[in-house]
Amino acid sequence: MPTFATPKPITVSIELSVGDVRIVASDRTDTIVQVRPTDDSREVDVRDAEQTRVEQTPDGLVVKTPRPRGLGLLGKPGSVDVTIELPAGSSVHGDSSVAAFHTSGRLGECKIKTTAGNVDLDETGPLDLHTGAGAVSVTKAGGDTEVTTGTGRIRLGEIDGAAVIKNSNGDTRIDAVTGNLRMNASNGDLIVGRADANVTGKSANGEIRIGQVSSGTVEVKTSNGEIEIGVGAGSAARLDLFTSFGHVRNHMDAADSPEPTDSVVEVSARTSYGDIVIRRA
């Protein structure tokens, strides 16, 4: 079990073919790396764990598993499980073919890419996350965020920054975002609890719901699904709403032009099949 002196946050680079990655960030001055075969009864798993390279660099650590020797009909590749305990605030760069990533504690910048595998993160700094197939869960991202999945649910808590979210097949839910938000889905709902800046959202098939927005511009469009937007108390709204097959329900009180000091939300909402609901948050 390699142990390294790391008195300050580091950068960990992980290259993993197949397996599982767990990272625990806490108030500590060292880093511990544990590499185990996923199944210690499989020779290929044991071999890959033994051949995994763990090296300290000037900026942090590199963890790299060997390349698979067989795929598909040629044989099942080896699988290893990596556990890293490191200082809070450390950055993580992960690249894998088939692997799940799990973190707990506060991390810094995170860049994670996996062809297939779920990603479950606790608290990060700026985040760049891409998975070809897998569910994504993030408790809090402290910086600009980009998340993409080919198929799978996306569940994001607080985003303190701008965000770009792309989901080809699956629902997307965000609790709160402070910066500009851009969302795209081919098949799935787009749900936002609170947006503090501009929002652009488009789904080919799915509902779009924004619980509260108090300023900025909202442009949302879906080909098939209901749209619901809550306008924050004390904010005026300029509305441009259209549905081809459905009803428009505006529960806002009619008013004259807003005062110069009022917050104004400009809403453009389009759906081909579905109702549009505008209400007070």
Language-model-detected regions and their locations in the chain:
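Intrinsically disordered, low-complexity terminal regions
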Residues: 1-281
